[in-house]
UniProtKB/Swiss-Prot annotation:
The modification Phosphoserine is found at S419. GO terms for molecular function: non-membrane spanning protein tyrosine phosphatase activity; phosphotyrosine residue binding; transmembrane receptor protein tyrosine kinase adaptor activity. Coiled coil: none annotated. It catalyses: O-phospho-L-tyrosyl-[protein] + H2O = L-tyrosyl-[protein] + phosphate. Residues 6-101, 111-205 form the SH2 domain. The lineage of its organism: Eukaryota, Metazoa, Ecdysozoa, Arthropoda, Hexapoda. Keywords: Cytoplasm, Developmental protein, Hydrolase, Phosphoprotein, Protein phosphatase, Repeat, SH2 domain. Required in all receptor tyrosine kinase signaling pathways. Functions downstream of the receptor tyrosine kinase torso, acting in concert with D-Raf via tailless. Also functions downstream of Egfr (epidermal growth factor receptor) and btl (fibroblast growth factor receptor). The SH2 domain suggests that csw effects its role by mediating heteromeric protein interactions. Maternally required for normal determination of cell fates at the termini of the embryo. It comes from Drosophila melanogaster. This is Tyrosine-protein phosphatase corkscrew. The keyword Amino-acid biosynthesis does not apply. Residues 227-645 form the Tyrosine-protein phosphatase domain. Residues 289-444 are annotated as: PTPase insert (Cys/Ser-rich).
Amino acid sequence: MSSRRWFHPTISGIEAEKLLQEQGFDGSFLARLSSSNPGAFTLSVRRGNEVTHIKIQNNGDFFDLYGGEKFATLPELVQYYMENGELKEKNGQAIELKQPLICAEPTTERWFHGNLSGKEAEKLILERGKNGSFLVRESQSKPGDFVLSVRTDDKVTHVMIRWQDKKYDVGGGESFGTLSELIDHYKRNPMVETCGTVVHLRQPFNATRITAAGINARVEQLVKGGFWEEFESLQQDSRDTFSRNEGYKQENRLKNRYRNILPYDHTRVKLLDVEHSVAGAEYINANYIRLPTDGDLYNMSSSSESLNSSVPSCPACTAAQTQRNCSNCQLQNKTCVQCAVKSAILPYSNCATCSRKSDSLSKHKRSESSASSSPSSGSGSGPGSSGTSGVSSVNGPGTPTNLTSGTAGCLVGLLKRHSNDSSGAVSISMAEREREREREMFKTYIATQGCLLTQQVNTVTDFWNMVWQENTRVIVMTTKEYERGKEKCARYWPDEGRSEQFGHARIQCVSENSTSDYTLREFLVSWRDQPARRIFHYHFQVWPDHGVPADPGCVLNFLQDVNTRQSHLAQAGEKPGPICVHCSAGIGRTGTFIVIDMILDQIVRNGLDTEIDIQRTIQMVRSQRSGLVQTEAQYKFVYYAVQHYIQTLIARKRAEEQSLQVGREYTNIKYTGEIGNDSQRSPLPPAISSISLVPSKTPLTPTSADLGTGMGLSMGVGMGVGNKHASKQQPPLPVVNCNNNNNGIGNSGCSNGGGSSTTSSSNGSSNGNINALLGGIGLGLGGNMRKSNFYSDSLKQQQQREEQAPAGAGKMQQPAPPLRPRPGILKLLTSPVIFQQNSKTFPKT
């Protein structure tokens, strides 16, 4: 689990019950400090309408449930029982930990880095900070406490911040009501270590990693000036350190639309079906873009907190790898793209010792060790006592993490797949198998420039050669052919109903349909008289000539349709290749679309408690093609688009929770009608004739699978199109429709819908109220039947519709509020806990 936001350090058992009843659902859980046993913890889980409390023992060396598996940290314990489901009552009933109930950050200040280990904090500050740079993070060993990490010359000092009696202190001296007050105090009054070193808090080291659910607070902070600061930092870090020799060659220069926007050599697409005797025949200005592994290079969660982290190498391999890696690798605990290319390391290229170790390694390891103060190369940490006024500090690395060997992963396999270099340590067939395995989990993109068609050069043929070679079935064009009187992209397709030959490619435009935001064209493409393939061309046409779109919803809707198409092609067995994205230069708008889709894809897989890092994601994709996300305005737009998506998702979940409380049962909800006849509807073929929504013991709230198909933004496609790799932590999300027959109660949420619809209208009063509630959110339909205004409706409009809905209902009887069990009676579960693995029953405590 990438976040520990399920830990609520300040609430009691009564408050935990109330919180779970009001905001949670079946399977929601949180962890808190024990009210009866200082130093221990309690896991509170909602099961139906009851809340079960499970005691967690902490003896100073390990955490356990009074028996069973032992864990070094509380996050390891929670992660284990979420994934393995071995927690049962004595009567055999399972206690499922489905979805964490997120706790608000203790502060919105950007110097707070959340669940960051001491080792990671040291690397960040020593690599990128200055003398006096500081940050605050959560304590790895004592949940509920925090650590202040400060750079003092060539070392990092860690000062423990205690949470006691609803106050913060550093082990002595004054107490403060908030972390901000504490930091402000020690900015003015520096601490002094026992060795005499003065610890100055000069400048904050601001975080870019955040919990997805907390994006509103982060955007509010960035609006004050942080956007410019983050983007400028990104510009300085994204130096061109990769070769672009092929693009500079004389025979290839005319193929570049812009002289200095060239593809990196290590990720560029190479054309195979060409006349190799012609110099530069295999060159095209295009790069592969993808995540090397799940969250690799930008999901900065500590590997020591993950039970599924990579197996550590033997000392020889680790030392050799560490010596080869650059400072950026050390910073991220991962092998960066450049080092991966230089050394051609794959995860399975370790020595025999490492392979044997991977078979026998236990799942649970100690992730922390104690040590005294050390310089930047230190190896351990532990709480100590120093300072002139009882300041508790930790002088040295806080939480050492296991170095991973060769975590460049699938990306290297991908690069070697398209490389003429056969000297790598691993065969092409092994890289192919690895690439196929991870292709199922992560999308690959091709970022390229707009086509050129002049008397001197024609790249249209090369473009279609690449599309055919890569089996690309979806092309995303984010620019007009002409903007401000200048050609941005040559037309590389024929008019509707016509065919055209481009070299060996024959293109037939079968259909062309337009919405208010984009045009969808369907092509039949054949190459060298081979059987034709269906290829879909999504042409986004409302990006303004200057700046970015005012409404992120239009981009989210567009990406939703793109990903829905890609997922349907995969289900049809066509095995679509990378999504090809281009604008004019292939870096600005192209990068913006790709990064938004990557971030949302992560949220779809891991839920709202996942930690995202927009700046680091852009830094990662820029290591594969230079300049992606070109301007500060585009950088802001990525934040706003992700924020809009999360706000809409949260509003949708709340609406569905409220609908469940009313108690109505919906069945036979059908979506019918022709698609494509209305220019305002999504131009997609009909694929879902009827969807039934029936009551179940499982609460109808979103799962990771139901949030999408693993294709980023395919909302609702989980009704049979779920991503098999999606996390199980999210609850199921039903597809619902507005009722158009209840005196207009839900109609505003159904405008511009993706096809006609009919709903069951029995018991009109409560049915109308629920549909008004759900209709006001503007829910997107599953599969091909998308509500075109799902993301575009602002939350303010949604709230207005919800407030107006009861008035529009006239004299319709309002449903009685649902009955809830009164919180206050703690059902402490201390004895009936059974662990399936060992079939043990543990005694009462």
